[in-house]
Amino acid sequence: RHPLRMLFHGLGTQAGLGGGSSDAASTLLALNKLWRTRLSRQELTAIGLQLGADVPFFLLGDNAWVEGIGEQLTAIDYPPTPFMLLKPPVGLSTIQIFKDPNLKRDTKPATIAGFAEIENEHKHLFGRNDLQPVAETHCPDIRHCVDLLKGYQPSARMTGSGSTVFAPWFLNHDLQAIPSNWYHLRCMSLKNHPLKHWAD
């Protein structure tokens, strides 16, 4: 069989939201079901890791604490939370960010134990993004996005290698006074991947 796959979504490239990795994971799950190969989630994960470091996370199907290069996953309970996404009209290359000599690689690692100690309603305050300072030098608009969102939510920060910025959004109104060419979206996080049940 030769599946024809057409995909439409609103995520731009180089957004730092794992769009490509999510697509890869969904494709693996769909082919596993279509071709009735009955590969286990563990087997799919081994394949997914060869496609990209973030693919195993999307194959897991749960919110997770991720370590290593993306293959060490611990499922966590994280309640559905409203978020605001804000992205300038430019993207960033992940390779470019990781090759930057100014990227700090010796910061103290965050731990799942520290995350577990925080009450659910404050978990969004945990953590940091070590890629953000470097990304901001390559794309100053990221800093502008962070500053704008921090006016509403102090925990605003960049996601992935950029260039999207996110913050929990418990307000009833939309963002105000943003440039017309910036992408923004109010969304709700999911407790599970919609296709999680397609793998054992």
Ranges and model annotations:
Residues 40-50, 146-147, 176-178:
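Short, well-structured alpha-helical segments that form the helix of a local strand-helix-strand
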Residues 164-168:
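Short beta-strand->loop micro-motif that forms the acidic, two-metal-ion catalytic signature
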Residues 58-60, 65-155, 170-200:
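Conserved, helical-rich catalytic subdomain that frames metal- and/or nucleotide-binding sites
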Residues 19-20, 159-163:
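Glycine-rich beta-strand-to-loop/alpha-helix junction loops that act as flexible
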Residues 2-18, 155-156:
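Short pre-catalytic strand/loop immediately N-terminal to key active-site residues, enriched for Gly-Thr
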Residues 7, 158-161, 186:
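A structural preference for short, hydrophobic beta-strand core positions in alpha/beta folds
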Residues 15-43:
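DPxDG-like acidic metal-binding loop motif
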